[in-house]
Amino acid sequence: CFGIGATLGPLIMTAILQASSSWRWGYGVASVTMGLVAFIFILTQSRWSGSNKVAPQTSSREGRATRGLDTLTLPVVWMSLLLFFLYTGAESTAGQWAYSLFTEGRSVPESRASFWMSIYWGGLTVGRVLLGAVVDRLNVSSLLRMCILATIIGSALIWWHPTNTLSFLGLALMGIAEGPIFPSLISDTPRRVCAGQVDTTIGFQVAAASLGAAALSSLAGVLAERVSLEILGPFLVVCTALMFTLHETVVRHAEGV
């Protein structure tokens, strides 16, 4: 659902800008949509509340939570956190700054740039849908390896920029390749840590992912202001290359345990 909304957003905003002289209508449409979603949640709140409670598991989870910080003493956990930090940082940076790079840095028409941003987010959605079709046929580590390598190639095409079309295709490749990475990394957590630390590790990983999305996209913006928007390409290449290095290190550690 996230990917679908992110795909439709640029298309809706482009259509509104072409039909109206004010960008405020776009935010108005978004506000009304979010209000309707909130209203629907309120109306159906009783259906979302489960009546079944599992008391024994609750106490067990609380016991593990008191030892949650012990998880941070494991080097493999810190490597996993950095891996999530880099992944969401690269995803967010490409999603937030590629449009500015294309329109302001490379004089691409706004409508065309918006179309390819929708392709990027749509590719991420398609990638996650395809994950369900291939996950049983491929080893998770092999799938992650291929996807991360594809993100490196995609970001390299954005940096290289022989033509606008190849840059657009690089962005699309990044979107499709990024789709399976987050859910695959989450599902592979039990292989990296022992059973009693899985829940806590996943929580830390999601927190690191949120931090990465905010921090790295902000850093990219600062660099773009001080250097140029063209810094986006090498920035993404560095992030994705570090992702690959970390993933291979984590895999070797897991196989050695």
Residues covered by each model-derived region:
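Juxtamembrane intracellular "pre-TM" segments in multi-pass secondary transporters
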Residues: 52-80
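Helix-to-loop junctions at the C-terminal end of transmembrane segments
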Residues: 127-140, 224-225
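Structural signature of the two symmetry-related core transmembrane helices
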Residues: 142-157
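A late C-terminal transmembrane helix in Major Facilitator Superfamily
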Residues: 193-229, 236
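A membrane-interface helix-boundary motif in multi-pass transporters
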Residues: 15-32, 219-240
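Helix-loop-helix hairpin linking two adjacent transmembrane segments in secondary transporters
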Residues: 1-50
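Extracytoplasmic gate region of multi-pass secondary transporters
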Residues: 73-118, 122-126
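Intracellular juxtamembrane helix-capping segments at the cytosolic ends
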Residues: 180-194
